[in-house]
């Protein structure tokens, strides 16, 4: 929750297979230098510090499961330094987890809204570790990256312009 918006998504482990098989759509190029930097970071820390923001078409099944949990007290609640509040519910009911997984299997396309370098570097690392692992099964932790799945109706995209630093008194 921000001063002007409320978002309700799912934080999950997303398979690099979905990235490699183009279920997750990319719309930006990435810089090889940054890909390698992030891959090295992941290899050294073993930790995704920030989720990749993925968006999907609104879905009534997913929404109803999220709404069920929102009726309960959140497991975690915190406020960031920029005054954004966060409530986190743990989905631990096996039936709900199964429904979420099955529903996302039916969604043909996810789009990267933020995190092209993070997702690419996660895939690079997974592919490299798979080659090094003679017992690779596809279920290892390195085959997944942290993502925040948000329905497209809740997504707000703001212009980002690297070249304009000052509007000289004009409003956007």
Residue ranges with predicted function:
Residues 1-172:
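Surface-exposed, charge/polar-rich loops and edge strands
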């Amino acid at each position: 929750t921000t001063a002007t918006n409320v978002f309700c998504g799912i934080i999950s482990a997303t398979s690099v297979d979905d990235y490699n098989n183009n279920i997750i759509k990319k719309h930006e190029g990435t810089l090889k230098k940054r890909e390698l930097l992030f891959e090295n970071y992941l290899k050294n820390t073993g930790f995704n510090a920030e989720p990749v923001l993925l968006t999907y078409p609104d879905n009534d099944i997913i929404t109803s499961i999220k709404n069920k949990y929102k009726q309960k007290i959140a497991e975690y609640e915190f406020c960031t330094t920029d005054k954004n509040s966060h409530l986190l519910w743990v989905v631990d009911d096996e039936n709900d987890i199964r429904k979420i997984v099955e529903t996302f299997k039916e969604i043909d396309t996810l789009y990267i809204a933020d995190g092209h370098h993070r997702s690419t570097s996660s895939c690079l690392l997974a592919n490299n570790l798979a080659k090094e692992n003679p017992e690779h099964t596809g279920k290892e932790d390195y085959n997944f990256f942290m993502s925040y799945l948000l329905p497209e109706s809740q997504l707000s995209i703001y212009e980002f312009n690297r070249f304009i630093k000052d509007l000289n008194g004009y409003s956007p």
